[in-house]
Amino acid sequence: MYKFAIFLRKDAQPNFFRNIILSTLNNSYFDKYVLCSAFFQENKFSTSSEIISAVNSTRTVNIDIYGLYRGTWNKQFNQFCSNLKNYYQNSSCSTNFYKFKPNSHAKIFIARKKGLPLISIIGSSNLSAGAFADRTSKERWNQECDVVIWDDSDSSSKKIIENMLENIPGELKSFIYISNYDQTYISSDISCLDKINKLENLMKNNADIYPV
């Protein structure tokens, strides 16, 4: 059964978006990740360092990267992709890089096991510092709103979400919305699994291979 949660970031901590992604990347149960962001940052904050720290190079895993909304971020996106390629090039971890075609601005994360999408995030958050960095309330952070979808019948996925929900302060619980996915409400002929697969195919069709 698929469930979904809507997280409105009310303060710098806890950063639900960051915590779910890193917990999922750090879990060797998953064998494929899709990271789609308008911006990847490589300066004082390094998105690639966060990914590399979470995904051990000894794992057999595939990582697909989609990005580069604006040309002004080309240098940082190229550096991000180069860092990942160089780190994983002699490992069993494979990386694939894609550049958005014009007008694409999606922010999507998908974790798969044997082809099945088990945890997904569709949101407003990019993988840049304002949304993804581990920051305090005294530092600049972005107020974002993200939708998390997971297969609650999968024990590993369920545990990641449960662990995250257990650490939510009481004053923030009113900013979190959780529900079961109701397939009979709309588009009943398309399952949640199929919708996520269609979403990834749409991203791939609206992107070009990015040479690194």
Predicted features along the sequence, with ranges:
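PLD/PLD-like phosphodiesterase catalytic module centered on the HKD motif
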Residues: 1-212
